């Protein structure tokens, strides 16, 4: 007996882990793609943990060689492009490595995964879900590289959906709001490291407002009521829907963020973030 399979990237923790568990509990066979195999799903029969480095095309190809060998029993019907990393930094202090890593993981690698997956999903007339964030609606100071990646992923989703309109494959985007996941654990430490490795004159400009932003972000994410399970339920709903919608939000904050991007003028959005940015006197320190 065959069983529909779904590939979930970024499955080792956080939102991806929750989605894998939810899908498996509801009868799907799940390929859980992780950077390092740790046997976290070894006791669950319908989850297969597979190694995947999104910055390495050979790693992506090897994953799909394995998936291709399973198609008789577990035809690939779904893809959840969930993997993502976020390195906070003022754009002036942003390291090239951090920018490239975020683009490789959040955009380029996921496009490559989609390219490899499409022949299988087109055959099964399946579904693709791209996970972005509220930062795909409004670009946020000190999360510039991540915002760039999320805007790119929104465009990637729109183009893919339009190109596949008559293929039988559906494409949806999910924008979660603030949800605590391990991605936040290194937020303040990473930000401080970037400041410590910056030239003194540049650090003086951004240090106060950047540290305040990092601390406020951690406090904010620890106070939200939206959970990983809420996210996982949305993913399951998309795969169970007769006809999935093109756009989903997880959490009121995500929907509100998107609405503000449509209602507020650019000037109003700039003013909204004004208190988060360096002051005129801080720029005069150099």
Swiss-Prot record:
As its record notes, the protein acts as a catalyst of: 3-amino-5,6,7,7a-tetrahydro-1H-pyrrolizin-1-one + AH2 = 3-amino-tetrahydro-1H-pyrrolizin-1-ol + A
Q: Name one GO molecular function term.
A: oxidoreductase activity
Catalytic residues, chain numbering: 146 (proton acceptor)
UniProt record, GO biological process: steroid metabolic process
Q: Name one Pfam family in it.
A: adh_short
- What SUPFAM superfamilies would the database entry show? NAD(P)-binding Rossmann-fold domains (SSF51735)
At the top level, the lineage of the source is Bacteria
Please give the InterPro entries that the UniProt record associates with this protein: NAD(P)-bd_dom_sf, SDR_fam
Q: What does this protein do?
A: Involved in the biosynthetic pathway of pyrrolizwilline, a pyrrolizidine alkaloid. Catalyzes the reduction of 3-amino-tetrahydro-pyrrolizinone to 3-amino-tetrahydro-pyrrolizinol.
What protein does this entry describe?
A: 3-amino-tetrahydro-pyrrolizinone reductase
What organism does the record attribute this protein to?
Xenorhabdus hominickii
Q: Which gene encodes it?
A: xhpD
């Amino acid at each position: 007996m065959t069983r529909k399979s779904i590939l979930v990237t970024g499955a080792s923790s956080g939102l991806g882990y929750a989605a894998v568990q939810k899908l498996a509990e509801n009868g799907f066979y799940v390929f859980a793609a992780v950077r390092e195999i740790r046997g976290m799903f070894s006791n669950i029969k319908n989850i297969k943990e597979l190694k995947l480095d999104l910055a390495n095309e050979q790693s992506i190809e090897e994953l799909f060689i394995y998936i291709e060998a399973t198609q008789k029993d577990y035809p690939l019907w779904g893809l959840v492009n969930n993997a993502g990393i976020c390195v906070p930094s003022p754009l002036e202090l942003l390291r090239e490595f951090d920018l490239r890593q975020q683009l490789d993981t959040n955009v380029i690698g996921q496009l490559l995964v989609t390219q490899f997956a499409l022949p299988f999903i087109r055959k099964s007339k399946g579904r693709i879900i791209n996970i972005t964030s509220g930062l795909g609606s409004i670009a946020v100071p000190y999360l510039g590289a991540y915002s760039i990646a999320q805007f790119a992923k929104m465009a990637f989703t729109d183009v893919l959906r339009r190109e596949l309109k008559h293929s039988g494959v559906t494409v949806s985007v999910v924008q979660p709001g603030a949800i605590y996941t391990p991605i936040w654990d290194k937020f303040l430490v990473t930000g401080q490291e970037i400041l410590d490795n910056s030239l003194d004159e540049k650090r003086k400009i951004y240090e106060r407002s950047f540290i305040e932003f990092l601390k406020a972000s951690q406090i904010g994410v620890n106070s939200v009521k939206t959970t990983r399970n809420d996210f996982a339920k949305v993913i399951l709903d998309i795969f169970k829907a007769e006809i999935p919608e093109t756009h989903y939000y997880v959490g009121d904050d995500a929907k509100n963020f998107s609405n503000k991007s449509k209602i507020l003028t650019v000037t109003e959005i700039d003013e909204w973030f004004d208190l988060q940015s360096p002051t005129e006197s801080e720029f005069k320190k150099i």
